[in-house]
Structures are given as C-alpha cells and as structure tokens.
Amino acid sequence: MPRYAQLVMGPAGSGKSTYCATMVQHCEALNRSVQVVNLDPAAEHFNYSVMADIRELIEVDDVMEDDSLRFGPNGGLVFCMEYFANNFDWLENCLGHVEDDYILFDCPGQIELYTHLPVMKQLVQQLEQWEFRVCGVFLVDSQFMVESFKFISGILAALSAMISLEIPQVNIMTKMDLLSKKAKKEIEKFLDPDMYSLLEDSTSDLRSKKFKKLTKAICGLIDDYSMVRFLPYDQSDEESMNIVLQHIDFAIQYGEDLEFKEPKEREDESSSMFDEYFQECQDE
C-alpha cells in the first residue's frame, strides 16, 4: 500500500502551521487519520501534536550559540536543514513503516531552501523511496495578494518551488476568513486570473519600458502554460477546506482503490466553486 504526504510550503507568516492544525481537525471529522511532522528547526510553537519534530534532532538556537560556527538566523537554518538531509535515517525511524500513512510535513518558510539548495528535493526523493506519494502544498497569504504586483510575485514563488521539486503542487490562498468583503471581491479575480487584464493594471504605473516588457513576458508565460492557479482556504468554512483536500487527494490519488472522481470544478476552467464561495460571503 502506498503512503501519502503533503509538503506544506510557503513564505513565513503564510499560515503553514495553522493550515496543518486545521487540516488535521478537518480530516479527523472525516474519520481520516492524518499525522504532522515539524520540519522547521526554528519553530517556537504550533497548535497540533507531532509524530516527529526536527528540533529533537537539531535546533537553530543551538547552532547560532555555537561559537565555532558563528551563524546568523538564516545561516543557522540552512545548516540545520543540511544536517537533517545527512540524517534522513532519523526521520525514517520516526515515521516507521505503517502502510497507508497520510502525513503533513510543516516546512520552513525560507525560499532559498527551494531555489538555491538541494535539501527539499532530496527530501522528496527520499520520501518517494519510502513509497510516499508526495504533493506540494504552497501557501500564500491572501492579504498579501490583493495587488497585481504582489500576486505576480506570489505566482513566481509558487512556480519556483514547483519547478525545483518536480512534484504535483496545489497552490492555496490562506486567511480568506480575515479578508473584508471589499477585499474578497478584489481577491476573486486572482483565483482564476486573466493575466493580460492584470498586466494592464500592473504596468500602468511603471515608467521603465524594460520593466513593462519584463512584466508582460512574465504574465504571458504564466498565462500560456496555466501552471499556477490558487484555491481559497477559509478555515472557518468546511466546504472550502474540503475542496482543497479533494484537489490534493486527486493529485496523489489517495484511495485509488475506491471509485475516485476528479474535483468537479476542474470540469470547467472558469469554475463555479469560486462564484459559490464568494456568493456565500456576500450573503453573510
């Protein structure tokens, strides 16, 4: 039997730990057993029980206090993750060999772990050797994405992780429950975006022709390949959480021995799910 894993990624403050905690609760309500592994050696606290915690192996504070190393916060975290990559046997012992495991890996937020270093790619390869089907779950804060330039930046960060890890990836806008009604209306256009329409919004204030040309090329690339789309994640709405889980389950073919249906909103590129979600928000 295969095992299943979500690699929960995203910038610091995007809600990775909150996502793990709420997704575990949601799965428990569905009578599904889901475990969490903390892979952030700089984590201070989280609202979920863990089956493994990288801080039992190595902590950033201990590395920074080592006078022979003299690392700062970022250097210390990189050292910790490279040490972790050299000690995957520790993780293997923590995970055990239970079939049909479903595990969320709460990852650090530093983008250089996905763009400059091989650590996360090595982790994916190791999990696959242990017969895990791995899906990347990339989170961005919806409050950060309400402007065109910030949205494009978020897409590039998600695309960077996707290209680096070469695994199925579901991209999520978190903290939808914290947005005002006006902000929710603004964010709706970013969930299934017309990149050329966003291009007009984002380049109107640019003075440099070179930057306008670059932005146009980026928007064209994103639109032509349609590789990055975002799903809304509202921890106060069970339907929103269930739709996200369905997409992830489909990506890793969770429960493939059962009759499995592709998430219905994929039948139409301009999905009705977004309309239903925002209509409910407006009716509240």
Swiss-Prot record:
Membrane-spanning residues: none
Motif Gly-Pro-Asn (GPN)-loop boundaries: 72-74
Keywords: GTP-binding, Hydrolase, Nucleotide-binding
Gene name tied to this protein: GPN3
GO MF entry, a single one: GTPase activity
Protein name per UniProt: GPN-loop GTPase 3
Similarity comment: Belongs to the GPN-loop GTPase family.
Superkingdom assignment: Eukaryota
Function: Small GTPase required for proper localization of RNA polymerase II (RNAPII). May act at an RNAP assembly step prior to nuclear import.
